[in-house]
Amino acid sequence: MSTDTILSFEEAMEKYDPVLGFEVHVELNTKTKMFSSAPNVFGDEPNTNVNEVDLGMPGVLPVVNKTAIESSIKIGLALNCKIAETCRFARKQYFYPDTPKNFQTSQYDEPIAYDGYLDIELEDGTVFRVEIERAHMEEDAGKLTHMGGATGRIQGADFSLVDYNRAGVPLVEIVTKPIEGAGSRAPELAKAYVAAVREIVKNLGVSDARMERGNVRCDANVSLRPHGRERFGIRSETKNVNSLRAVEHAVRYEIQRHAAVLDAGEPVIQETRHWHEDTRTTTSGRAKSDADDYRYFPEPDLVPMVASREWVEELRATLPEPPAERRKRLKADWGYSDLEFRDVVNAGVLDEIEETISAGASASVARKWWMGEIVGRAKAADVDPGHLGVQPATIVELAKMVEDGKINNKMASQVLDGVLAGEGTPEEIVEKRGLAVVSDDGPLLEAIDAALAAQPDVADKIRGGKVQAIGAIVGGVMKATRGQADAGRVRELILEKLGVTA
């Protein structure tokens, strides 16, 4: 594992300016692969969704997937790119076991989309423009699984297994121009940019956009230069970072590592790096290749593709509401304040709250549950809130039980814990745990008498008009009933008992 010396982030920022660059690979959710009729299905038995084209058998010819081209154009349009009138595929030559043809069919100097931009909103509302160099089509490689090692990497593994189901799956690679001027907000910008790309492709419906499945993967490039210098430093590329937090942490770590190398008077090596989530460090991969090393040349088996302006405009007309406009609409519909809505977006639960409202919850109740209960649990479990396993219908059911007086908020929180533990539905958990609210006034009056007897001075204050002191008595009753009393009803009974009008 990594033994790199690193500088503190603050010290690195005092001395250097970071320059970032991202290559985000988006798997398209087409029914078949990019150049073959083999199914594009995640999770099937290894090496079952493969045919002779994917394996590069002699004499086979590729056929371009039209839906993949349409999806690529839609992505380009959503990224404010220009769509090339003519583009072509190229062969990217390299040998690796997950590439059965010994080349990848990609695009080189004639991509389908180019010269775009994305305006990225940071957590405090600051907008940072990221310029897009290009978005090009290519096919994915197979998947290698390294067995016997401690880290899951090839280093130290006893052997490797290869699954070609992913070989030939259509990809769009989105490449940014160098990103300058982010300063100490570079890690935050990295996370926000990848989140924005993921949101766009999910909104377009062209990708499942599940990072944990590899539908969206990010290669993060980092270099540093001393303050005031224009020339870029040597960059490293951290490959296949597959979560938003990992992107943020990887960029932060690489900034600290580069700063330590430069401070020691040593050269930064242009290389790929591997990210390790458990230690939140990177380790060296291989020397970074330049384009010349891949010996690109035009794909001889595919003719250049012409995207007529009429076709492009037809596709533009099918684009859904852009995410930024959707957020503006939802904020107005839900009546959230600027701060409330920004917190929802930053927590990554916008879709979940929308689904919960669609399932029947009010906007305030949906926000209360996701922000007040679920986000905290997700942080404790170190997962994204949407991956915690809570369904919108569950939130609606819990909220209805509270509204109907069957359980109180404290009990509802316990029921949620039971749902996450797999104990059953909310109704089943309430019954199993005996969590129903005490609705009979008899037991409540007994608990109230005991609480008043234990705190006669508080009872006198309430009789004397200091009604706010009632909280101590209510607390005693709630403790005696193990939180199963209706606090509102308890308060009413206490005031009646003491002959006080609220």
UniProtKB/Swiss-Prot annotation:
Named from the GO MF annotations, one term is:
glutaminyl-tRNA synthase (glutamine-hydrolyzing) activity
Which GO biological process entries does UniProt record here? glutaminyl-tRNAGln biosynthesis via transamidation; translation
The record's InterPro entries line, in alphabetical order, gives: Asn/Gln-tRNA_amidoTrfase_suB/E (IPR017959), Asn/Gln-tRNA_Trfase_suB/E_cat (IPR006075), Asn/Gln_amidotransferase (IPR018027), Asn/Gln_tRNA_amidoTrase-B-like (IPR003789), GatB (IPR004413), GatB_Yqey_C_2 (IPR023168), Gln-tRNA_amidoTrfase_suB_CS (IPR017958), Gln_synth/guanido_kin_cat_dom (IPR014746)
What keywords were assigned to this record?
ATP-binding, Ligase, Nucleotide-binding, Protein biosynthesis
Its recorded reaction(s) are: L-glutamyl-tRNA(Gln) + L-glutamine + ATP + H2O = L-glutaminyl-tRNA(Gln) + L-glutamate + ADP + phosphate + H(+); L-aspartyl-tRNA(Asn) + L-glutamine + ATP + H2O = L-asparaginyl-tRNA(Asn) + L-glutamate + ADP + phosphate + 2 H(+)
Q: Which SMART domains match?
A: GatB_Yqey
Report the superkingdom from the record.
Bacteria
One family name in Pfam for this protein: GatB_Yqey
Task: Give the E.C. number(s).
Answer: 6.3.5.-
Q: What class of enzyme is it?
A: ligase
Does Ligase appear among the keywords?
yes
Q: Does the keyword RNA-binding apply?
A: no
Role: Allows the formation of correctly charged Asn-tRNA(Asn) or Gln-tRNA(Gln) through the transamidation of misacylated Asp-tRNA(Asn) or Glu-tRNA(Gln) in organisms which lack either or both of asparaginyl-tRNA or glutaminyl-tRNA synthetases. The reaction takes place in the presence of glutamine and ATP through an activated phospho-Asp-tRNA(Asn) or phospho-Glu-tRNA(Gln).
Q: How does it assemble?
A: Heterotrimer of A, B and C subunits.
Which family would the database say this protein is a member of?
Belongs to the GatB/GatE family. GatB subfamily.
Q: Which PANTHER family match?
A: GLUTAMYL-TRNA GLN AMIDOTRANSFERASE SUBUNIT B MITOCHONDRIAL AND PROKARYOTIC PET112-RELATED, GLUTAMYL-TRNA(GLN) AMIDOTRANSFERASE SUBUNIT B, MITOCHONDRIAL
Q: What protein name does the entry list?
A: Aspartyl/glutamyl-tRNA(Asn/Gln) amidotransferase subunit B
Name of the gene:
gatB
